[in-house]
């Protein structure tokens, strides 16, 4: 019998008395031995994201195609409880909405789980509607960042979503599936949102899981052709194959543009020993040679990072890896140890060259710290990547020029420039939109579209500045020579780049003949579907 706790209800527009809900289900003693697969099949899906114009899907030849770690964790957890999960990665395998629906109807799972990023909500809704039309008994469960930040609004808008799992979903999904199979009442399942007629009901959440070591190993074995079919972005790795690991969850900072707080600000981490075990597993079973750590804040704990590095060094493990960091979390001592342990690249969220913009973002950092962090990292022999945002509220012609000059002054090897996007769940979203939810903007929220322009500027002007900042960084002789050497040193980059350029030339010719000109999704490419409430 599981323990029970009393938790007050938090229900939109409806109050209920306190009730007893179960704590997480007990798991088998040996997490590597799943329970017998005697229960239902469960499809876990990432829907197609409308980022690229039709005919230009090959752009994925050079972009990051990492599998969804969230789905891998969910699959591993429910498999422990006897369910039979399988994963459909739409974007990675160029699957359309119709392709996904066809696969689901062919496999006939009892449950369909769809992860929702804002850009994919409309396609997820279309998939759900078509599945429901052909198989009304199939239960659609949604989760992910978007639903965790806008559960009520999304469930009211798209009625083919049966149940939403809010926040980290491993234990909640296992509880939910077991409850549904037993014919239980949804009121007894924590961490979910669902509709009762026109009323949105929100069940209380489970306590945050602090012990990530308790989670089973991600179900990499369910991925077809892993890791070959899931490469990192070109020039973003020194060798193949590549795999991703999240060594921790959560971020204690509160940058206004970021939606990470949707899953909580409290940092929870695997032990260094468990992370090392994951690395060894990927090496031994899949031949992985480079790890991308995708933590919100990899260097949240220097002692933990130090211990992991020592485990790698002392064992003689030959692995290279990349991670992200804030500029105020690095020091020469830890950087030197990271380099010895195989750290190849650190990505820093620098965001802007203007202290004024950084302050308005609540970034809790400044230009001087950024310059020092990049200097220390470069001195340690670790490659540096700068992550920037253009078009944030308060941006002006002057701040853009300051950022442009700042980017060029840094000894960074790669620069990612994102078009400011006010994601649901971020503090800035509510500031800009208030309660006026623009769901017609959701399908464009991919960092490739300016949906909003600061006062005194237009979207067209922002697009011009965006191109100018990018080209001013990459068209310099120093950068062109660097990428030439990198291409010659790592032939895997050359093969993918040549394949991309060939496909691009062919597609560009076709598009010009057809009177089209865009690589990124254009307004005329989008299909706006009318969903009945």
State what each model feature region is.
Residues 5-38, 48-59, 189, 195-247:
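N-terminal [4Fe-4S]-dependent radical SAM core
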Residues 51-54, 151, 197, 302-303, ...:
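Flexible glycine/acidic-rich beta-alpha junction loops that bind and position SAM and/or redox cofactors
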Residues 99-100, 104, 309-312, 396-411:
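Short, electropositive alpha-helical surface patch
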Residues 218-387, 392, 401-405:
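Radical SAM [4Fe-4S] cluster-binding motif and immediate context
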Residues 153-171, 340-345, 402-417:
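Structural recognition of alpha->loop->beta junctions
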């Amino acid at each position: 019998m599981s323990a029970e706790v009393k938790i007050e209800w938090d229900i939109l527009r409806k109050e209920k008395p306190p009730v007893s809900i179960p704590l997480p289900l007990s798991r088998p003693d040996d997490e590597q031995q799943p329970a017998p697969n005697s229960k239902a099949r469960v499809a876990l899906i990432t829907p197609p994201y409308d980022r690229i114009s039709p005919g230009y899907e090959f752009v994925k030849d050079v972009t990051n195609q990492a599998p969804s770690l969230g789905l891998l964790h969910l699959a591993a957890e429910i498999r422990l409880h006897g369910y039979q999960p399988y994963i459909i990665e739409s974007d990675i395998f160029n699957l359309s909405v119709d392709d996904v629906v066809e696969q689901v109807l062919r496999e006939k799972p009892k449950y369909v789980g769809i992860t929702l990023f804002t850009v994919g909500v409309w396609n997820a809704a279309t998939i759900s509607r078509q599945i429901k039309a052909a198989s009304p008994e199939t239960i659609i469960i949604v989760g992910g960042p978007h639903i965790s930040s806008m559960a009520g609004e999304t469930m009211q808008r798209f009625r083919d979503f049966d149940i939403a799992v809010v926040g980290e979903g491993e234990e909640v999904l296992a509880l939910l599936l077991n409850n549904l199979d037993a014919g239980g009442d949804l009121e007894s399942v924590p961490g979910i949102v669902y509709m009762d007629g026109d009323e949105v009901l929100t069940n209380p959440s489970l306590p945050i899981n602090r012990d990530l070591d308790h989670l089973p190993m991600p179900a990499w074995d369910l991925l077809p052709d892993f890791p070959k079919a899931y490469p990192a972005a070109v020039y973003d790795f020194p060798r193949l194959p590549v795999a991703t690991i999240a060594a921790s969850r959560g971020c204690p900072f509160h940058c206004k543009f970021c939606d990470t707080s949707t899953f909580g600000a409290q940092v929870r981490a695997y032990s260094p020993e468990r992370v090392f075990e994951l690395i060894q597993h990927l090496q031994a079973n899949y031949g992985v040679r480079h790890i991308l750590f995708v933590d919100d804040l990899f260097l949240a704990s220097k002692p933990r990072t130090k211990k992991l590095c020592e485990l790698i060094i002392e064992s003689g493990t030959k692995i290279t890896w990349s991670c992200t960091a804030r500029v105020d979390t690095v020091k020469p001592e830890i950087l030197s140890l990271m380099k010895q342990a195989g750290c190849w690249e650190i990505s820093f969220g620098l965001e802007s060259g203007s202290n004024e913009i950084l302050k308005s973002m609540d970034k809790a950092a400044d230009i001087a710290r950024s310059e020092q962090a990049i200097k220390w990292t470069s001195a340690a022999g670790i490659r540096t990547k700068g992550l920037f945002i253009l078009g944030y509220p308060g941006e002006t012609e002057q701040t853009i020029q300051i950022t442009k000059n700042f980017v060029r002054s840094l000894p960074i090897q790669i620069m990612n420039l994102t078009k400011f996007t006010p994601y649901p769940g971020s503090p800035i979203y509510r500031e800009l939109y208030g309660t006026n939810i623009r769901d017609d903007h959701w399908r464009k929220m991919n960092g490739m579209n300016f949906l909003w322009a600061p006062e005194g500027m237009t979207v067209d002007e922002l697009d011009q500045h965006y191109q100018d900042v990018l080209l001013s960084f990459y068209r310099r002789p120093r950068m062109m020579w660097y990428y030439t050497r990198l291409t010659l040193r790592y032939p895997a980059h050359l093969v993918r780049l040549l394949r991309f350029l060939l496909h691009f030339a062919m597609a560009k010719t076709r598009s010009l003949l057809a009177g089209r000109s865009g690589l990124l999704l254009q307004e005329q490419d989008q299909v706006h579907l009318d969903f009945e409430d």
